[in-house]
């Protein structure tokens, strides 16, 4: 997946870095006129939960629909955190969105120890404002910081 992200950045002619943990940051310059804006970080991870799979590298997922929901037999669908990663890549690819400097940080090993995020170099991240795209729902943004905030708002 890290290889794909680097190729994605190259195709869009965006700056990127890859660290020893295979975490990838892709940077998109601000829309002209918005260069002075504070950089925003879109955070996600590329690994998934391999629930119930004896051999995740060689197993297939049997998907089915139940009451309007896609499910998998004996495992997860593997979509965590595919939603966040997809949103971040869509933002990078869409030149119609007005924005300040953007950083998309995609970490590794979130599901089994957070070692990708835990070992990020301070130089890897330029932005100080982070939007965590790892949520269970596509219309929910998860935020955090020094001051607890509780807000439930749907975004479309």
Give the residues covered by each predicted segment.
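Active-site metal-coordination/substrate-binding segment of hydrolases
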Residues: 34-101, 106, 110-112, 117-128
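Short, structured patches in soluble enzyme cores that scaffold and shape functional sites
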Residues: 106-108, 133-135, 155
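Short, glycine-/Ser/Thr-/acidic-enriched flexible segments
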Residues: 31, 47, 138
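TRNA-recognition modules of translation machinery and tRNA-sensing kinases, especially anticodon-binding
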Residues: 142-155
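Conserved hydrophobic/aromatic beta-strand scaffold that supports enzyme active sites
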Residues: 25-27, 130, 152
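A glycine-rich helix N-cap at a beta->alpha junction
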Residues: 120-144
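A non-catalytic alpha/beta surface segment that caps or lines the substrate-entry region
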Residues: 1-38
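Short acidic loop-to-helix transition motifs that present clustered carboxylates
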Residues: 21-25, 111-113, 138
